UniProtKB/Swiss-Prot annotation:
<dbReference type="GO" id="GO:0042941">
    <property type="term" value="P:D-alanine transmembrane transport"/>
</dbReference>
<feature type="binding site">
    <location>
        <begin position="38"/>
        <end position="45"/>
    </location>
    <ligand>
        <name>ATP</name>
    </ligand>
</feature>
<dbReference type="InterPro" id="IPR003439">
    <property type="entry name" value="ABC_transporter-like_ATP-bd"/>
</dbReference>
<keyword id="KW-0813">Transport</keyword>
<dbReference type="GO" id="GO:1903805">
    <property type="term" value="P:L-valine import across plasma membrane"/>
</dbReference>
<comment type="function">
    <text>Component of the high affinity leucine, isoleucine, valine, transport system (LIV-I), which is operative without Na(+) and is specific for alanine and threonine, in addition to branched-chain amino acids.</text>
</comment>
<dbReference type="InterPro" id="IPR003593">
    <property type="entry name" value="AAA+_ATPase"/>
</dbReference>
<keyword id="KW-0547">Nucleotide-binding</keyword>
<dbReference type="GO" id="GO:0015188">
    <property type="term" value="F:L-isoleucine transmembrane transporter activity"/>
</dbReference>
<dbReference type="Pfam" id="PF12399">
    <property type="entry name" value="BCA_ABC_TP_C"/>
</dbReference>
<keyword id="KW-1003">Cell membrane</keyword>
<dbReference type="GO" id="GO:0005524">
    <property type="term" value="F:ATP binding"/>
</dbReference>
<dbReference type="GO" id="GO:0016887">
    <property type="term" value="F:ATP hydrolysis activity"/>
</dbReference>
<dbReference type="GO" id="GO:0015808">
    <property type="term" value="P:L-alanine transport"/>
</dbReference>
<keyword id="KW-0997">Cell inner membrane</keyword>
<dbReference type="GO" id="GO:0005304">
    <property type="term" value="F:L-valine transmembrane transporter activity"/>
</dbReference>
<dbReference type="InterPro" id="IPR017871">
    <property type="entry name" value="ABC_transporter-like_CS"/>
</dbReference>
């Protein structure tokens, strides 16, 4: 059996006297779609914040391809190929759609100050390649015709897709999506489902998803992890989770 691309053991996060995350375990295989579900306030986003370096976990291990990454700052984790979206759209609203993508591409540009100042052939070539890659991802998320529109003027579902495209500009190995279907209508949710499937099948991306839309979760996930009150409650296939009495109780309460 191959080693998981991401493995989390005993993840713990305290805020003073509050134990927000308590002993969460997670294994993600390459090219899987793994969903993390649970009632509001269960600690799911806190887990994401620990995995991506926004929080420094109090305890536990986070391994990416066997390398421990807990405690690393967010930008170093991103450079290792782990990127994320947030519950709230975080685009540069005054910039165009294509400019939002180019911002995410800066680390891959073969440029420096002098090259930019003198517009060297290497700089121009790097700039051209960045534009071509941005155009590619605008096409992948069906936003080509909106390339020069300000991001803030796009429909909400379009902004969500643009956020995912911006993540993909960094060539990630793991894409973490925090409630990407929140606020979407059924057609937009179907488009999101198709996009996630495409990222996995055509771009070899592993997806870790927080989502409350159970229809989407059950239809797209290979594996589901359930968290309740900061602690692991259950994990398994969609079929196993659907019929788990502890999961049903956590969502619906006891009769």
């Amino acid at each position: 059996m191959s080693r998981p691309i991401l493995e989390v053991s005993g993840l713990t996060m305290r805020f003073g006297g509050l134990l927000a995350v308590n002993g969460v375990n997670l294994k993600v295989e390459e090219k899987q779609v793994v969903s993390m579900i649970g009632p509001n306030g269960a600690g799911k986003t806190t887990v994401f914040n620990c995995l991506t370096g926004f929080y420094q976990p109090t305890g536990g291990l986070i391994r990416l391809d066997g390398e421990e990454i807990q405690g690393l700052p967010g930008h170093k984790i991103a450079r290792k190929g782990v990127v994320r979206t947030f519950q709230n759209v975080r685009l540069f609203k005054e910039m165009t759609a294509v400019e939002n993508l180019l911002v995410a591409q800066h680390r891959h540009l073969n440029t420096n100050f002098l090259a930019g100042l003198f517009k060297t052939p290497a700089f121009r070539r790097s700039e051209r390649e960045a534009m071509e890659y941005a155009a590619h991802w605008l096409e992948e998320v069906n936003l080509t015709e909106f390339a020069n529109r300000s991001a803030g003027t796009l429909a909400y579902g379009q902004q969500r897709r643009l956020e995912i495209a911006r993540c993909m500009m960094t060539r990630p190995r793991i894409l973490m999506l925090d409630e990407p279907a929140a606020g979407l209508n059924p057609k937009e949710t179907d488009d999101l489902k198709a996009l996630i499937a495409k990222l996995r099948s055509e771009h070899n991306v592993t997806v870790l998803l927080i989502e409350h839309d159970m229809k989407l979760v059950m239809s797209i996930s290979d594996h589901i992890v359930v968290i309740n009150q900061g602690a692991p409650l259950a994990d398994g296939t969609p079929e196993q989770i659907r019929d788990n009495p502890d999961v049903i109780k956590a969502y619906l309460g006891e009769a």
